[in-house]
Amino acid sequence: MGLLDAGITNHNVLVTSVDNVLNWARLSSLWPMGFGLACCAIEMMATNASNYDLERFGIFPRSSPRQSDLMLVAGTVTMKMAERVIRLYEQMPEPRYVLSMGSCSNSGGPYWEHGYHVLKGVDRIIPVDVYVPGCPPRPESLIGGLMKVQELIRMEQIGLSRADALKKLAENPIDPQAIIEQQRKTAVAH
């Protein structure tokens, strides 16, 4: 249940909770910082292009960690790069989220077995909220992952830990295709 689902009384008053207002504002203006390290970055760039139009979801890419609330890690993270990933993560303001995109950032990809220099998943150095599988994942998969981050934000409550919010999200999974179709119908109607 979001802000727009709240009850409207007397056509002048909106009755809702502070959690709903704060979460609606945060999920409606998600500012990701892309950290593309390999071929997954090409798919991330394609997702930002006009074909997929992330701005219709309220997602506006940023290039500075100080302006971002979501880090998109895409590609092979090496041991030398790990320090920089941690530094960028620490520069992001709270609340901050991490989306790991592709096999390499999720688990080391095809390089994990024979590459001593490859990190076996970015979650070994920073906490990851959403994983997007694939090698490389299609833009539709990335949009689905971004929508999961938005659902995670929607379920947050003041005083509720992120772990509990993740459990709620696992109990009530979302269907990204249905939401994209709903967005298309709304755009056609207007």
Swiss-Prot record:
Location, primary (coarse class): membrane
Q: Which GO terms describe its biological process?
A: aerobic respiration; electron transport coupled proton transport
Give the way it sits in the membrane: Peripheral membrane protein
Q: Which InterPro entries match?
A: NADH_UbQ_OxRdtase-like_20kDa (IPR006137), NADH_UQ_OxRdtase_20Kd_su (IPR006138)
Pfam families, alphabetized:
Oxidored_q6
- Coiled-coil ranges from the UniProt annotation: none
A cellular-component GO term for this protein: plasma membrane
Q: Describe the task this protein carries out.
A: NDH-1 shuttles electrons from NADH, via FMN and iron-sulfur (Fe-S) centers, to quinones in the respiratory chain. The immediate electron acceptor for the enzyme in this species is believed to be a menaquinone. Couples the redox reaction to proton translocation (for every two electrons transferred, four hydrogen ions are translocated across the cytoplasmic membrane), and thus conserves the redox energy in a proton gradient.
The entry sums up its family as follows: Belongs to the complex I 20 kDa subunit family.
User: Would you tell me the protein name for this molecule?
Assistant: NADH-quinone oxidoreductase subunit B
- Organism, by scientific name, is Chlorobium chlorochromatii (strain CaD3)
